[in-house]
Amino acid sequence: MEKRVTFAGNSPITQNAAAEDSQADEKIFLLSPANLKGVRGQRMLNSNIKSALGDRLRAEGACLAELFCHTSSLYFRGKLAYARFFARPPSGLEGSFIITSSKGLLAPDTVVDIATAKELASGAEIDLEDDRYRIPLRRDAEALQKALPEGCQVVLLGSVATEKYVTPLKESFGRRLLFPSAFLGRGDMSRGALLLRCVRENRELTYSPAEMKGREGRRRS
């Protein structure tokens, strides 16, 4: 697996026409992951069940974002599209990273092999009590924090209802860590639809400081 928290190279699709009108000159996104432990994820990882993506994953690897888009509902696809459209990373940095259960922060186009995919699906829990999750995340968040120029915003596209994301990320990014205010009170499907609509309309959401907000909606990922 190619570890991409070296921050080398920008995605070619992080530019958008609204850049001059948005809230900050520079902005990156952190995406909560999709669940590889569900039925679609397990079918993809099962060598006895044939699929184009599963076969490619076993033969040569596949991009992490592709795996999550395959297994996810609308929510992850919305997060990925929104981050790619509205990110304005500083020179030399990625515009978005995916929070993982045991590999810290990975760029969406990181190629993972079948062993890594199975580890992400069945290994560490996204729980602050699990060092396999917490330590790599803090390591990569600290490295990213040191690489970011002053004024660059870090936007969490994920739940702020529990401490599993907010607490470790806040320790590294402090006040620059934000989240979309419109996420409050919405479930995952509603958030995904909202994010895709924002991309279609070239309309960026308003962000608030990331603090734990209690119950947000039916699901919190």
Spans of features found by a protein language model:
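Peripheral peptide segments
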Residues: 2-221
